[in-house]
């Protein structure tokens, strides 16, 4: 491959991030680092089980690649369930919660790292996810829905920063079901407002025109 060629591939991207990590660190740095280490051990064990590999870490974030969408989802579900058990234990001092986003898309390989929209959308899905939750893209949903027993909640088309995508929550508990504004509903609202403005301006123009006609006739 020449230096100018871009090395691309299709990949399943898994992004996990700790909720409120900075606040935990401010409260008790040592205990938080210890708790994160234990969560990391759980995740590494599951990544090994489901054949996922970490390609980047940034502070409290973990970015991993999977060859299988089903494996990525099952890894995420098992990880959240393991964390729930850990947090319910009275022995757990610092209870860390994670958000997880999973996407399948085109990525660029560079110096052992993965870049591009495929990664960016996974990160946006992670930001969209609830604490202790998992959000996935439609590309993942279409593959895993007939092959897994988990429950999904359709969030519709979402826009986070510059990325627009169809998202789904994986419901680990019925209480996680939510309804949030979709990109299409925002467009409908904007269209409705624009239409109202046009009608209002049309009414003003019609009123002024009729008034002028009456004045001229007099």
Cite the ranges covered by each PLM segment:
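Intrinsically disordered, glycine/charged-rich C-terminal tails and inter-domain linkers
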Residues: 132, 139-210
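Catalytic beta-strand-to-alpha-helix segment of the class III nucleotidyl cyclase homology domain
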Residues: 4, 41, 63-165, 169
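Feature marks short, surface-exposed loop/turn motifs that line or immediately flank catalytic pockets
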Residues: 20-22, 108, 174
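Generic detection of intrinsically disordered/low-complexity segments and helix-coil linkers/edges
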Residues: 15, 30, 60, 146, ...
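Catalytic NTP-binding/metal-coordinating core of nucleotidyl cyclase/transferase enzymes
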Residues: 2-75, 82
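A generic signature of intrinsically disordered, low-complexity regions enriched in glycine/proline
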Residues: 21, 32, 190, 212-214
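Exposed boundary/loop context
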Residues: 13, 45, 52, 94, ...
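Charged/polar helix/coil "stalk" or linker segments at domain boundaries
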Residues: 208-218
